[in-house]
């Protein structure tokens, strides 16, 4: 079972990824984890990726694609994988198709967790952090007992700069633009499965598992 997990920031991908790998014996492979592992293992591609990252440059597609191929060829991914954070471009999606073809495998489903942008804004801008102890709150899902004050030590709560509405809105716009052609690509291949991510977490999980059970 070879799965790609997609969704905008705040859609709950991390939560659903955890539930999927609990239910199915496949590794959760995120782009960040892949890079860290390749660099730690000092593979040729890992060293090459590190040289770009150390210079503050974007890692070229051919290096990223090579690292993906190495990772999904490992023993723990032979029965399947859950890929998160890749592909990000049509070129990467086509490269992944080529890799899967070389490995005589295919992508079984692309799970896209859909949440209205307004709801994502609420989720992403509601985070507050205690300036003393670092405890995280959420104005909607996990509010402090007293507005603006930490329950634990009475510290003042603040909003991180990248959680402010303007930054979040820009981030969502970039992600929508980036993901649209990839979703169309997989829809044309007949493997795209859209999930309503605005439901309760357990309901979303049940919907995801139901799709995967029927592959």
Curated annotation (Swiss-Prot):
PROSITE patterns: ADENYLATE_KINASE (PS00113). GO terms for biological process: AMP salvage. The gene is adk. Monomer. This is Adenylate kinase. It holds the Pfam family ADK. Keywords: ATP-binding, Cytoplasm, Kinase, Metal-binding, Nucleotide biosynthesis, Nucleotide-binding, Transferase, Zinc. Belongs to the adenylate kinase family. ATP binds at residues 10-15, 127, 136-137, 199. It comes from the Bacteria. Disulfide bonds: none annotated. It comes from Staphylococcus epidermidis (strain ATCC 35984 / DSM 28319 / BCRC 17069 / CCUG 31568 / BM 3577 / RP62A). The keyword Metal-binding applies. AMP binds at residues 31, 36, 57-59, 85-88, 92, 160, 171. Zn(2+) binds at residues 130, 133, 150, 153. Catalyzes the reversible transfer of the terminal phosphate group between ATP and AMP. Plays an important role in cellular energy homeostasis and in adenine nucleotide metabolism.
